[in-house]
Amino acid sequence: MSHPRKSLDSVIHAPVRFSIAAALASVDEADFRSLRDAVEITDSALSKQIALLEEAGYVKVRKGFVGKRTRTWLSLSPKGRAALTRHVAALQAIASGAPPAGNTD
């Protein structure tokens, strides 16, 4: 049997990225400022973490204009949603001392 920690996602596991993914999982899309405020980090920290999540294919970034101002919207991709679901299941399995569902090793 394989320990559930082996199912943890190294991209999402970092606390800030986990918080970002969890926040995006609860909405269809969030604007940059709202997400920054929800996760309580700086603009530069959010930009850096979003770049890593986007590179992994976990987050989609959409830019547009509201009036004359540039606005950035973020959403969790299907790949990101699946990774978050697996990661949370692994955390729950670790916390409960049981193997993750579907693990027959």
What is the predicted function of each stretch?
Residues M1-R5, S19-A23, K79-D105:
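Amphipathic alpha-helical dimerization/coiled-coil segments
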Residues P4-A45, G64-S75:
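N-terminal helix-turn-helix DNA-binding core of bacterial DNA-binding proteins
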Residues I50-A51:
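Short, hydrophobic-biased segments on the C-terminal half of alpha helices
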Residues G57:
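Glycine-centered, phosphate/nucleic-acid-interacting loop/turn motifs that mediate DNA/RNA or nucleotide
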Residues V61:
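Short beta-strand "wing" residues that participate in macromolecule-binding interfaces
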